[in-house]
């Protein structure tokens, strides 16, 4: 309980707001390929931060995105997960659950901090919808791991 309170205080001060431009970042994905955020200007992207790969809560959330991923693709929406895990851990998780989208390793915790999603020990479970112009369209600070993917898809397609 104490750690959760500290995590909240730790990142609230630096949170981005809807309408802000997304910070530019470079991270390695699960295959150790460099992901450059600037290369995705012109595309809508869902970026979600999560605590740890292969934990019960995060597995539900990731599989929720997997289960309706085709709908995201049909609507030209990319999905990307970011955590402090190593690229290797993310690759194992992606393969274990047959997850069709990319995961990025923020092992230095710099990207989470730039988004205001950093916590003391893990990133906060937060999601950012980034529009085609690189601006934050929507921020989800409260996440229901069972329905999160469906909620985002509904919000973006209705």
Language-model-detected regions and their locations in the chain:
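Conserved redox-active cysteine motifs that mediate thiol-disulfide chemistry
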Residues: 49-67, 71
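Short loop/turn microsegments at loop-to-beta-strand junctions
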Residues: 22-23, 44-46, 124-126
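N-terminal targeting signals for export/organelle localization
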Residues: 1-28, 158
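A short beta-strand-turn-helix
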Residues: 25-45
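Short, internal strand/loop/helix patches
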Residues: 80, 91-125
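Thiol-/selenol-based redox modules, centered on thioredoxin-like
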Residues: 124-158
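Short pre-active-site segment immediately N-terminal to redox-active cysteine/selenocysteine motifs
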Residues: 43-45, 50-54, 86
């Amino acid at each position: 309980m104490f750690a959760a309170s500290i995590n909240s205080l730790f990142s609230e001060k630096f949170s981005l707001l809807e309408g802000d431009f997304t910070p530019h970042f470079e991270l390695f994905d699960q295959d150790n390929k460099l992901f450059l955020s600037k290369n995705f200007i012109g595309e809508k992207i869902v970026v979600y931060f999560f605590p740890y790969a292969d934990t019960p809560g995060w597995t539900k959330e990731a599989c929720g995105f997997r289960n309706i991923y085709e709908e995201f693709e049909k609507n030209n929406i990319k999905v990307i997960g970011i955590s402090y895990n190593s690229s290797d851990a993310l690759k194992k998780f992606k393969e274990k659950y047959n997850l069709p989208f990319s995961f990025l390793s923020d092992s230095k915790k710099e990207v989470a901090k730039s988004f205001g999603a950093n916590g003391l020990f893990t990133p906060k479970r937060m999601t950012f919808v980034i529009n085609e112009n690189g601006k934050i369209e929507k921020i989800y600070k409260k996440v229901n791991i069972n329905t999160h993917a469906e909620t985002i898809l509904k919000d973006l397609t209705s």
